[in-house]
Amino acid sequence: MSQTKTLKVRVALLCILVGIVLALVAVVTDHWAVLSPHVEHHNSTCEAAHFGLWRICTKRIFVGDKERSCGPITLPGEKNCSYFRHFNPGESSEIFEVTTQKEYSISAAAIAIFSLGFIIVGTLCALLSFRKKRDYLLRPASMFYIFAGLCLSVSAEVMRQSVQRMVDSEHTAWIAHSLAWSFICACVAAALLLVGGLALLLLALPRMPRDPWESCMDAEPEH
């Protein structure tokens, strides 16, 4: 592999590395979405919430005279967090009482796990490719990174639809929502994994001959 090509491969791997870090941050944090209830009484407290793939946190926030909504979530208040019990039927947070909503949440978490699995396998292939004459391992590594980006983008879209469906439901007290920084990290990570994986795949593929005679001319003469 030439020095120019090696430099391009390193740039692609750096892009993928940033995507991996953002993907891990998105999966382990709980700021995918922020939910706000309807404010009926001023000079009282309201309960806002933010959640991720595994945990939901509610916070009691004081509402002033001029406030029309509950929040922002960064205001000080009494905080209470609980983990989702995705795989235990009949045990879920009160906010996820609707069966369809719980299915959405389980799907997003499961797809995110697949994404992390693809990242781990792709990273192993990339590390093994650094050994001499093992550049061919960059091809499966790039494919695994592309699959990870696709899974993460699907997980983000499922979560977005999940939140929208919950807010639109008649069985919930939440009337407003906003996608938070963990969701943005997931979207950026998916884009970096897709772009970096595709670039790495193109760099790892063998060079096609410019004309039909090139491969014959480059062949070693028979003795």
Curated annotation (Swiss-Prot):
Gene3D superfamilies from the entry? Answer: 1.20.140.150
Report the main location listed first in the record: membrane
What is the name attached to this protein's record? Answer: Voltage-dependent calcium channel gamma-1 subunit
Q: How does it assemble?
A: Component of a calcium channel complex consisting of a pore-forming alpha subunit (CACNA1S) and the ancillary subunits CACNB1 or CACNB2, CACNG1 and CACNA2D1. The channel complex contains alpha, beta, gamma and delta subunits in a 1:1:1:1 ratio, i.e. it contains either CACNB1 or CACNB2.
The protein's recorded glycosylation sites are 43, 80
Keywords of this protein's UniProt record, alphabetized?
Calcium, Calcium channel, Calcium transport, Cell membrane, Disulfide bond, Glycoprotein, Ion channel, Ion transport, Membrane, Transmembrane, Transmembrane helix, Transport, Voltage-gated channel
Signal sequence region: none
**Per the record, what ranges lie on the membrane's Extracellular side?**
30-109, 157-180
Q: Which Gene Ontology cellular component terms are annotated?
A: L-type voltage-gated calcium channel complex; plasma membrane; sarcolemma; T-tubule
- Keyword Cell membrane belongs to the record: yes
Q: Name one Pfam family in it.
A: Claudin_2
Q: What does the UniProt record tell us about how this protein is modified after translation?
A: N-glycosylated.
Residues on the Cytoplasmic side? 1-10, 131-135, 206-223
One GO MF term on file is:
voltage-gated calcium channel activity
Name its GO BP terms in alphabetical order. establishment of localization in cell; regulation of calcium ion transmembrane transport via high voltage-gated calcium channel; sarcoplasmic reticulum calcium ion transport
Q: Which residue ranges run through the membrane?
A: 11-29, 110-130, 136-156, 181-205
Q: Does the keyword Membrane apply?
A: yes
What is the annotated localization of this protein?
Cell membrane, Sarcolemma
Question: Which family does the UniProt entry place this protein in?
Answer: Belongs to the PMP-22/EMP/MP20 family. CACNG subfamily.
Q: What does this protein do?
A: Regulatory subunit of the voltage-gated calcium channel that gives rise to L-type calcium currents in skeletal muscle. Regulates channel inactivation kinetics.
Bilayer topology reads: Multi-pass membrane protein
Disulfide topology? 57-81
The organism of origin for this protein: Bos taurus
- The source's superkingdom equals Eukaryota
